[in-house]
């Protein structure tokens, strides 16, 4: 993996490509860099596995093709976002702010995937407990963000020492997933958890945007939230935020499907009785 990244960086720094020279990586400890990188790859791999697992009763060739397409699309997204950050093309001070554009594209992509037929397939083909449990990635992620704050990469308000309480989503995801696995009918608990997770996610997204070096900046303490324009930190919005948004949308759709199924059940049971009378 290190060799692959080095080759990509070398390619991007080739003057014949007419790209900017590679920007220096924001100073961070090797442990933080590789734990961040590893978690992003794990989340990407989990998405591909989920696509394959949700194939259900489709033919083997169709399931294989869908999995390969998901893997190719995911790998392309990872490579493009990393390459853009490594090439220095992402910035919050340019007009338009290219880093902000990328974040907006990521959010739009997440909503598109979550509300698509693929999102519906994930909602119906993956157990609710698993859909909730995968959001536990936000616990180690928040530990990394706190470490990033301690190392001077990002402002305090984006960590749990400030106003970011999303670590509660990651911790509670484990508990709620285990509870749902034992009591599949406890959808009210899942509904409350999902709503709370969305609120906490919206909170940190708002704080992050208002901490960027743009005209709408509200938090003026240093450093500004511009580290996500660098590699590999660009994967914070491009991978982790996207995964969180897709996850919440898919869980919402799963809960809606189950609510509709419960509404239809009494009517289906009453139909034979009415016919017999």
Regions found by a protein language model. Name each.
Residues 6, 18-44, 91-103, 234:
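Hydrophobic transmembrane alpha-helical segments in integral membrane proteins
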Residues 192-207:
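Hydrophobic alpha-helical membrane-insertion segments
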Residues 37-47, 103-117, 168-177, 235-253:
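Hydrophobic cores of alpha-helical transmembrane segments in multi-pass inner/ER membrane proteins
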Residues 1-15, 263-277:
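Short, intrinsically disordered terminal tails adjacent to the first/last structured region
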Residues 118-186:
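Membrane-proximal helix-loop-helix units in multi-pass membrane proteins
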Residues 214-234:
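Short, membrane-exposed interhelical loops at transmembrane-helix boundaries
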Residues 76-147:
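A glycine-rich, hydrophobic loop/mini-helix early in the fold
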Residues 55-66, 90-93, 118-127, 181-190:
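Membrane-interface helix-boundary motifs at transmembrane edges
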